[in-house]
Amino acid sequence: MSSFKPTINRRQSTKIYVGNVPIGGDAPIAVQSMTNTRTTDIEATVAQIKALERVGADIVRISVPTMDAAEAFKSIKQQVNIPLVADIHFDYRIALKVAEYGVDCLRINPGNIGREDRIRAVVDCAKDKNIPIRIGVNAGSLEKDLQEKYGEPTPEALLESALRHVEILDRLNFDQFKVSVKASDVFLAVESYRLLAKAIKQPLHLGITEAGGARAGAVKSAVGLGMLLAEGIGDTLRVSLAADPVEEIKVGFDILKSLRIRSHGINFIACPTCSRQEFDVIGTVNALEQRLEDIVTPMDVSIIGCVVNGPGEALISDLGVTGGNKKSGYYLDGKRQKERFDNEDLINQLEAKIRAKVAQQDPKNRII
């Protein structure tokens, strides 16, 4: 990888803990997702949480819309190790119930949680049990008076919603919280976060809400979150996709990886292919991405179909392949090796080399 990297001066925020995961301060930016199963389907929800954990999720959020779901949460919490956030809307009593069951964080929506006395009840409970809170402002559920005041969701409206609830928590002498101001429009979300970042010191949870399907949602999230992260704004993030939640974690880490903020797994450098390719680049990359999903150790692997750009990319990669006639050149740590790969068996050979280097470089295969 090129040594050129602009300096990102990260916004200084206070640090809180969601379970054992630090958020804010100098902590790594945490990547989280949310289950899309029925919470009352305990088996399916636990399975999905474990799938998210396998691809590197730091935190998982669960919707808890009813008291039945709260009872299910109790069982779910007992079966997983990853920190769980309970997503609470409308009924503050559900927050009090999951607090009894060991929830690691409570997400409340100012637009629908109700009067200040209800917020006070949640805060008193959170204080007593040392549970952090996320104030989750959303453009789609802004308080009625703010909608009337501003005419539509605006950055100023989202900021005002957030600050009025930050003020309540401050008044109650509660500082273990993070804040989000999400919108489905990139410009609205980005400007809202910029204003919020200047106004408070608490950690910020980033997200472009309801971003869309797997492709469009990933692009929209990369643009919006990328803008903020490059400015040093953000302490944890969730990519919202109408897709398998596992994809949210992958995209989240890809965004951080692209900005070289947090490394996770294989960074594939691959050409878009043309008639010069000497092997099936697209098929090779797709196969290796699937086979190597379990690898979380950071590594740059270049897969280039010909000798035009292949050698140059391989020089700045941990491992590299440059297409050749029947056999392709192999690079290790930027140096050309005598060994060459048979194009017909390139996928298997390259996978073996990558796994061998991971075992040598990082036996625990850990996330950075």
From Swiss-Prot:
Family matches, as InterPro entries: Dihydropteroate_synth-like_sf, IspG_bac, IspG_bac-typ, NO2/SO3_Rdtase_4Fe4S_sf
Record-given protein name: 4-hydroxy-3-methylbut-2-en-1-yl diphosphate synthase (flavodoxin)
Gene3D superfamilies: Dihydropteroate synthase-like, Sulfite Reductase Hemoprotein, domain 1
Similarity section: Belongs to the IspG family.
Pathways per UniProt: Isoprenoid biosynthesis; isopentenyl diphosphate biosynthesis via DXP pathway; isopentenyl diphosphate from 1-deoxy-D-xylulose 5-phosphate: step 5/6
Top-level taxon in the UniProt lineage: Bacteria
Keywords from the named record: 4Fe-4S, Iron, Iron-sulfur, Isoprene biosynthesis, Metal-binding, Oxidoreductase
Lineage, highest ranks first: Bacteria, Pseudomonadati, Pseudomonadota, Gammaproteobacteria, Pasteurellales
EC numbers on record: 1.17.7.3
